[in-house]
Amino acid sequence: MSKSINLALVGASGVVGSKIISIFEKKNIAINNFYPLGSSSVGNHVIFNDHKYQIEELATFDSSLADIAIFSAGSNVAKEYAESFVNNGTYVIDLSSEFRYEDDVPLVIPEINGNILSELNGPTLIANPNCSVSQLLVAIEPIHRNFKVDILNIATYQAVSGTGKEAVEELTNQIKHDKSDVNVYPKQIAFNVIPQCDIFLENDFTKEEMKVAWELSIIHI
């Protein structure tokens, strides 16, 4: 029988946090104590396995209560709090890009290099790769293993949900109404494709494009 865990979820009320909750429910992963954490959403509630949980304040939470903490609240939050969780004995899985390029932080896709997890010496930070990289490598790795891939020409189409709830709401409003305010993106996003994801860098590539290049060089297949 697998051990039940005490889980903290930072950003529990966000788009990604909500999806994480639904995956844990679907996979029927044994959770002993669940701690939804946030800042602006403190006092709100989330439903997990038919139980109602009140979101607690991240800044004052006793992180030693959690065996594992998943950070899904962006780079700034991860930068401020993630390492303190590790120092208190918690394994931290960070979904942002904050720690992906640190030499001492493993960048893990379980299907590709999950063996790294068995080699960890106690609580540590674990970085989650860019979503495009994860999907790409899961598909490409078995092909590369058997036939060797030399060149990749990659095109990705990013979901509006990746920008957050405000972007989803803006898309919904634009679909429902002929005219709607454009606040999140530089142009109307409904029925449109904008050839830019994240900021442009000095080399004229966007940061999102460079994340793919950087992370492919870190995760060896």
Indicate where each model-derived feature is located.
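N-terminal Rossmann-like NAD(P) cofactor-binding subdomain of oxidoreductases
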Residues: 1-189
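Long, contiguous binding/interaction regions
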Residues: 172-173, 178-179, 183, 188-191, ...
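Conserved small/polar residues in nucleotide/adenosyl-binding loops
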Residues: 219-221
